[in-house]
Amino acid sequence: SKILANFTAPYTATPVKRMQEAGAIMLGKVNLDEFTYGSSNESSAFQPSPRNPWKTDRVPGGSSGGSTASVAAGEAPLSLGTDTAGSIRQPAAFCGVVGVKPTYGRVSRYGLIAFASSLDCPGPVARSVKDAAAMLQVIAGADAHDATATPLPVPDYLAGIEDGVKGMRIGLSPDYFRITYPDPVTGELLSQVLPAEIELAVRQAAERLASLGAEIIEDVPMVNTRFGIPAYFVISRVEAASNLHRYDGVKYGHRSDLSTNDLKAMYKHTRHEGFGLQPKLRILMGMYVSAAQYSEQYYRRALQVRTLIRRDFEAAFDPRGKYRLDALLTPTTPTTAFEMAAVYGDSVLMQYADQLTVPANHAGVPGLSLPG
C-alpha cells in the first residue's frame, strides 16, 4: 500500500524471526494485493503486479500471489503468506504449489499487518508437502507477543509423513461441488455446479486415495458452506475498518503534503492519497454494517453464520459422530486461474473466488492446497 511505502518496521515478525533463527536466508519481500484485499494480486499499489509463471496472461491468484508465483517460478524453495479467506490456498492452486493455512492460533500473528484479526493465519508456501511441513514446524508455536497464539505443544509435522493414507476416512461433500453467487441485477442468490474439469480432478484424487487404502465417505453435509462468503463480507469488513484506522499519517507511513492546520483534514487527505480502492471499500462497508442501527441485522447474524459453519466441521470430524473424518477432500477454487484484468474491478465476483476456502477460516481449522 502507498500508505506504508516508506515504512520500516521497528521489529521483526515472529514467523520471519523464527525462520531466520533456523538458518533461513531471506531473499526479500514479494508483492501482494493491497493489505491482502484481493484474489488476483492486481490491487497492489506497486505495479506491475505479479503474473502466473506458468501462463503469463493469467493471474497468480491472491492475495499471496507473489509468494506462490516466486515458489512456482523457482525463485525460492519456500515463501511465507497469509490466509484470511483462502489467500494462501487459492494462489497456491493457481500456481501449482503447496499452500497451507494452519489452525488459527498455531502460528503467531505478531508483526503481521492485520486485515481481519479473527481470521488471519500466516502459513507456508512450498514446492512439496514435506517442505511445507518443515517450514510449519519452524514457525508454529506459542508467542508471548500474541495472545491468540495457542500455547499447545507443536506436533512433529514430519513424523509419519511417509506413512500413507491407508485406513484414513476422507470425506466428499456435495456442498463443495456447487457454488452460490448473487445475481448482479436482483441480488438473489443463485447456485450452479462447478465446471466439470474441476469436479473430475477431485473425483480422480478420491479414486487415487481409495486405491492407496483410504476409505472415501460420500455425501458429507456441509450445508452452511454457501453462506461463507456473505458472512465473510461482513466480518472481515468490520475488522478491516477497525484495523485500518491506525493509518493516519501521524506516527508512521504516508502523510499528505497538503498544508493544513486541521487534524481531521490531514487524516482525510492522507487516507485519500494513501489507500487504494479496495481499502476504501472495506472501510465504508465495515463502518456501515457495524453502525448501531445495522449491527444486529448484519454483523451479529454473520457471527451466527460463522458458528453454524464451525458446527458443520465439528460434526464431520467428531470421532464419535456419524462421519468420523480424518480429512475433507474439496476443490480449492471454483475456477482455474483467470486472465489478467478479466475479474479485477468486480469486488463481489472476486470475493466469490474464495467460496470454497473461506469456510476453513470461519471454523479455524487447517487447510491444505495440493497441486493435481
Predicted regions and their residues:
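Short, well-ordered alpha-helical
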Residues: 1-8, 36-37, 151, 157-161, ...
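Short, well-ordered beta-strand elements within core beta-sheets of diverse protein domains
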Residues: 3-8, 120-127, 286-291
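Structural signature of FAD isoalloxazine-binding scaffolds in flavoprotein oxidoreductases
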Residues: 89-95
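Glycine-rich, small-residue loops and helix-cap segments
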Residues: 9-12, 20-21, 25, 198-203, ...
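Short, solvent-exposed turn/loop segments enriched in Gly/Ser/Thr/Pro and often Arg
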Residues: 30-38, 223-228, 333
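A short helix-breaking turn/cap at a secondary-structure junction
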Residues: 98-200, 204, 259-269
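Gly/Ser-rich catalytic/binding loops embedded in alpha/beta enzyme cores
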Residues: 1-84, 203-213
